Amino acid sequence: FYKDKNLSLKIKGYGDPLLLSENFAEISRILAKKIEKSNTIAFNNIIIDDSYFKYPVIIPGVSKSSEPYDAANSSLFVNFNTVNFKKNINGEFISAEPETPLIPFAAAKIKSSGIDNGRITFSHDQNDSGLYAGHLLKYFLELEQIKLYGKVKHGFIDTNKDKILLKYASNFSLEEIIAKLLEFSNNFISNQPLITTGAKLYGHPGTLEKGVLALSSYAGDVLKLKNFTIVEGSGISRKNSISAIFMYKTLCEFKPFRNLMRHEEKEYYKTGTLCGINTRAGYIENSKGDLYCFVVMVNTKGKSTKNIMKKIYKIIEK
């Protein structure tokens, strides 16, 4: 968070996948105290700098629908680039989350969507994710009696001239982020750290290509995997491909972190589903406490992994 010579408040994002309304409320309280000490009582514009990722980020397999799993990746966004809403008894749109106000910017997008309730994503075409973040921050700043007279718009930080007000780091560790994306199978969250890693290794702006290069290099050079194809980080694209044996090798390396996966009885696992494809992979314990890695990939339409898992349970008890 920066202040420029024109008294504009500038925000630069670095791809935090778990930035939520509650964080903006906290940030606004911290900023209000800092601003009070600097004798600044008002700002002109809120300027959004989302240039850490190259725009637009096109993920193979993701469409331009309003579904949450099709949310556009960006270096600055809030609430997974979605808004959750419903109608009250008077037929008026309201927020479905008490911690998130339904601000006019979001309400206008909801009305144009033609949807009565649920979640919508912000436009891929108009780069609305950063603007929504800016408008939401404006709302919380005004609650802290900080006046803002200008607009919310895109722009850039000039680190040589702009004065830094606050550096905000995510409250979540990387392990916590991975646990959440595994729990909710969130395609959007999956690609955020991928793109950020690419930017960190090969320089910004972050791109999907740089992220894929980082992941592919690790898979080949460190895990020694062969004959695989990675085009994005979530698995939503049918162009991703890997054999069961190399997925097994990956699981062997991930074993120390298995507690991040969904856990039921003696099984840590992750499922995956595309049309005509069902998969399940993870770790399973037998009655003696022995731990096994397992991979099940079914590409026959109408078939599931259930019967195969029953056989695996029997095999490990022999």
Model regions and ranges:
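C-terminal soluble interaction/assembly domains
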Residues: K226-K318
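Conserved serine DD-peptidase/penicillin-binding transpeptidase domain
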Residues: F1-L225
